[in-house]
Structure formats: C-alpha cells, structure tokens
Amino acid sequence: MTFDKVIFDIETTLNVDKIWCIVCKHNNTYYQFKEDRVHRFVDFLKQTKEVIGHNIIGFDIPVLNKAFGYNIFKNCKITDTL
C-alpha cells in the first residue's frame, strides 16, 4: 500500500528524551505508533510520498531523525503548516 499524503504529529516528554507516540492520518484512517512500536513508523514512511504537519520542520522531524540516527524523511516531500 502506498500513501500519497499523510498528516502526522508526535508526542514527547518535555525534554524530548522519549517519544510517547506518533499519530498519522491518511484519508479518514488513523495510524498510531505507541512508545513500544515507534520503530514501525519508519516502515510506514517508506510507503509515504508526502508528510504534512504543523511545525514538523522545526520540531517533529529533527526529534525523529535524532531518535533514529538518520534522516528517515529523505524520500518524502515535506509540507509544514507553520
């Protein structure tokens, strides 16, 4: 399955040392990657053409790239609503 456009947001601790969950929406379907399954978000991204979110360039993307140790968004178009 390929996802054209996916809206996403992450929830972290205040000092960003832990990712609680990542929530994505494609059409009217929600996908939730809780703390113990956050790593599965990378596989989800491999099927995604564009990610959309608010302040994802300034916050979400850097946090996730740091957590995974590389640019997990390298193959996605990025649209930030901020």
Model features per residue range: what roles?
Residues M1-T13:
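Long, highly charged low-complexity segments
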